[in-house]
Amino acid sequence: HDQYRDFYKAAPSFDENYACRLPDGSIPEHQRWAGGPQSYLCATQAPYYVKRNFTEIKKHGIRLDGAYLDVFTCNEGDECDNPEHRMTRRECYEFRGRCFEYLLSQGILPSSEEVSDWAVPSLVFCHYAPYDFMMKKPGTPKEGVPVPLYNLVYHDCVIQPWMMDKVSEAEDYMLYALLNGGAPYLIRDAAYPNIDGAFDDNVTLSRKEEIERSKAVTELHKQVAKCEMLHHEMVNGDYMVQETTFSDGTGVRVDFRKQTYQIFHK
C-alpha cells in the first residue's frame, strides 16, 4: 500500500508549493483520514516521489513484485493552477499513468484502488471493482439492475478481486464474482468500520466455508482470467437469472432468486 495524492502536513517532505492550487489561489485541505491535516499533491510531482521511494526500497535489497498505488483510479482527476506546475484533469491522469508505467519498467506489477479506462494500459490488478450497490449498507434498494458493463470491455485486461460477502440468505456477492469471472477476496478488512462496502452484519461463515467458496471462484478465474467476456444476457428476459460467456467457451449462469450458479462449456 502506497499513495501519492493525499499530501499530509506532518510528512517531512510536505511543501505547500507542490499542493494542488485552485484558480483563486486557495489550496483544498481536510483532515478526514488517520494521517491528519492534508492537502493534495499535484500529480505533476507524483512520478518523482514514486521513483524516489521505490529506488530507496531497492537500495535496501527489497525486491518487490507488486505495488498498490492507492486512490489514483477511484478519484477524479485533479486540476492545479499553480503557475509553476499547472495541470488539467487529462494531464493528471497522464501523470498518474506514468507512475504505473515506472513500476512496470522495474518489473513491479502495478495496482490501484478501482478500475478506470484511462489506467487500463498500465494497470495489472486492482483492489476491487464493485457494483455501485455493494458500497452501500446491505438492504439498500438497488438503482436499476446491475450488469457487468466494465468487464464486457476490459475483462481480459485487469485482474479484479471481488467481494465474497454473503450479506443475507437472499444476497450472496460470490455470485457476482462468478458472473464476472473475477478473483475472490478470502479476507477483506476496510481501513475504517462500515466504509468501502465492509459492513459487520453479514451472514457469518466459517473460515473453512470461506476457503471453499474462494476455491470455486479461483478455479473459474484460472480458466477465464485472460479471456474476453463476449456476451451477457438476462435469461428469458428474467433479470434475476443472468449469464455470461467468455472467449474460451466458458459460460456462467447465476440465479439470484435461488442463489445458485452453473459453470459450463459451450
Question: PLM features: residue spans?
Answer:
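Active-site-proximal substrate-binding groove within the catalytic cores of carbohydrate-active enzymes
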Residues: 22-25, 34, 40-266
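Flexible glycine/proline-rich, aromatic-decorated loop/lid segments
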Residues: 14-28
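Active-site cradle of extracellular carbohydrate-active enzymes
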Residues: 3-18
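Flexible, active-site-adjacent loop/turn segments at secondary-structure boundaries
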Residues: 12, 38-39
